[in-house]
Swiss-Prot record:
Alphabetically ordered keywords of this record: Mitochondrion, Protein biosynthesis, Transferase, Transit peptide
Reactions catalysed: L-methionyl-tRNA(fMet) + (6R)-10-formyltetrahydrofolate = N-formyl-L-methionyl-tRNA(fMet) + (6S)-5,6,7,8-tetrahydrofolate + H(+)
Location(s) in or outside the cell: Mitochondrion
Function: Methionyl-tRNA formyltransferase that formylates methionyl-tRNA in mitochondria and is crucial for translation initiation.
Protein's recorded name: Methionyl-tRNA formyltransferase, mitochondrial
UniProt-listed GO biological process terms: conversion of methionyl-tRNA to N-formyl-methionyl-tRNA
Amino acid sequence: MRVLLRCCCGHLPVGGGAGRRSNPRWRALARLSASPGWEDGQGARVREKPPWRVLFFGNDQFARETLRALHAARENKEEELIEKLEVVTVPSPSPKGLPVKQYAVQSQLPVYEWPDVGSGEYDVGVVASFGRLLSEAFILKFPYGILNVHPSCLPRWRGPAPIIHTILHGDTIAGVTIMQIKPRRFDVGPILKQETVPVPPKSTSKELEAVLSRLGANMLISVLKNLPESLNNGRQQPAEGVTHAPKISAATSCIKWEEQTSEQIFRLYRAVGNIIPLQTLWMDNTIKLLDLVEVDNSILSDSKLTGQAVIPGSVIYHKQSQILLVCCKDDWIGVRSVMLKKTLTATDFYNGYLHPWYQKNSQAQPSQCRFQTLRLPPKKKQKKKIVAMQ
């Protein structure tokens, strides 16, 4: 008869790693755990194989795919991988809640809003895009610890926005890491499984998220099928190659015309454009660039673009293609629509703003009528909170 370890006394130091294997206490417990139905010293037995009881933590669309895979595994009675599945998500201003909560409610899964985590007993926790640090005391309540589905090849892109930074920096290879959570710091725990995929050319962060979310969900199920073995074979992250993926802000979306090349601007657009529209200044007004397009070579050969020195940020309306051409550090980008009080096509913007300006200032140089870099004050850094759950 299998009996699960009570949540309040889970002190099994599972998960391999050189540090724990060299610890005498870990070696002693490992020898004990090798015997069938080993006890933790308080009379409770630890389940040695599936089905597992899982507490899932997540919020967004990426996490939703992981939850969907866990739910499908729970519904598959033939495999007997998941016996119990409950969900923790953060509160949302929307009555519907975030994607994870929506899925949990639709699927009739028990769902708690952080910091409430319920009072059930679980074998293992799973985190995907949760964004909250968990205390060591809380992690130790899970006999098999807490796993994290992270959409990067750790240690590259530690932090809350790995997919965005993958696109932003022009990476050609992306991936997913299944790792074990450690307290006090994000994304530093032992790696249990890691796979890579090529980044499709000109992929947006949303498109790459869809690819990586499916990959990560499948990898997690694979790890859960051989959980004790996966934990014992975990490897520490290398010290080399560490990069960080901080959370984006409105300031991230501000184009620096004098500093950024057309390639960098398009990467920025593909990375954050679906979350925060790119922004700039026009005549002291903030203007959002909604639809960016690459400029055809035939347009770039126009004498208006090549016949004079043009200052970065200069705006020219190209009537034939009905786009705004904007000069950046090394080239031009095209803009099909903008938002200035309301959404305007490039033609609307020209007729309503550019053309009247030129009529009033017929002697002025085109360089005087240009987009300029919008400087937003950086957000104050907030202290990370480690929540010690009861």
